[in-house]
Amino acid sequence: MKKLFSLVLAVAMVLSMACFASAEENTTLTIVAWDVGTTPYYQAQKEAFEATHPGVTIEYVDVASQDWDTKAGTMLSGGDTSDLFMVKQNINIMNWAQQGFAEPLTDYIAKDNYDLSGFVGMEPNYALDGTQYALPFRSDFWVLFYNKTLFDAAGVAYPTNDMTWEEYAALAKEMTGKGNCKYGCHYHTWLSAIVNFAVDDGKFTLLGGKYDEMKYFYDLALSLEDADACRKYTELTAAGLHYSGAFQTGDTAMMPMGYWYVATLINNIKNGLCDFEWGITALPHKEGVQAGSSFGNLTGIMINKKSEHKDLAWEYVSW
């Protein structure tokens, strides 16, 4: 989707887009994505694209986020003909391109003289050996979610925009066991939910070959596990517990997570799946690192080489 780098922009653009092209008639365009049912903007995009492309129906294949790498890879290797696949991690598109599953986009971009400037230099993340295999779909940064209801009940001040990781850990331990608060914090099972905080100093890079900076964050998470201030990684992986399920139980005080979760949380509260006051603040930071520092996640979209509607799929990608 063109210039969709945040949830707000995604929804705003699809609601304001006018019809500018006629698409194939009576065609179903299938998109494989994760957590469609808990991500409201997918429905908004479906409705907007269908409204501007009469005769086209968008159909989603919903895959649980924790099963994405295995499920999506199995579908592609099995010859699945779904038209579009979301790209959760850069390693996805690198593998899929090398395995011949991704349709090269370079010729489509050249044919339409498609302007890539709106991606502000992010599109090379999805290129391999000079060929573009996917385009950015969404970009998000990480924040700290917190349960205001639990903090209010405990009489403890909310987390702030200028809080060190040591202060965060102390606050998590303080909140643990107070009233209905069972856990002071929550770490999801993704690698990024631990190690990516190390890049917030603007110096360390995950591509540098040295990973000493990560140890601090591993040790911090393990210390919180040992203090029973967060759910244990082994228990989370065994149960397959989604981060939204963990936070929405209402017994967790804080959770570092991407900004995309805002729309899901609002929607789930609206639908009665949870009921508490909540807020967001900047991620904690290490001593000497500027307050408000964060890191981002990029989500991409690619055309399946087995798609039978490649031109229409490109129209969706470039829309």
Question: Predicted segments — roles?
Answer:
Residues 36-57:
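Short, polar/charged alpha-helical segment
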Residues 62-71, 88-91, 163-169, 234-248:
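Short helix-initiation/N-cap motifs at beta->coil->alpha
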Residues 51, 57, 154, 269-319:
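Extracytoplasmic/periplasmic substrate-recognition and gating elements
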Residues 1-30, 51:
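Short, low-complexity disordered leader/linker segments with a strong preference
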Residues 25-36, 56-61, 83-84, 133, ...:
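Short, well-ordered beta-strand elements
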Residues 88-141, 275-282:
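Hinge/lid segment of periplasmic solute-binding proteins
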Residues 75, 82-83, 112-150, 182-184, ...:
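A structural signal for short loop-to-beta-strand junctions that line the ligand-binding cleft
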Residues 172, 206-237, 283:
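Glycine-centered hinge/linker elements that transmit conformational signals in sensory
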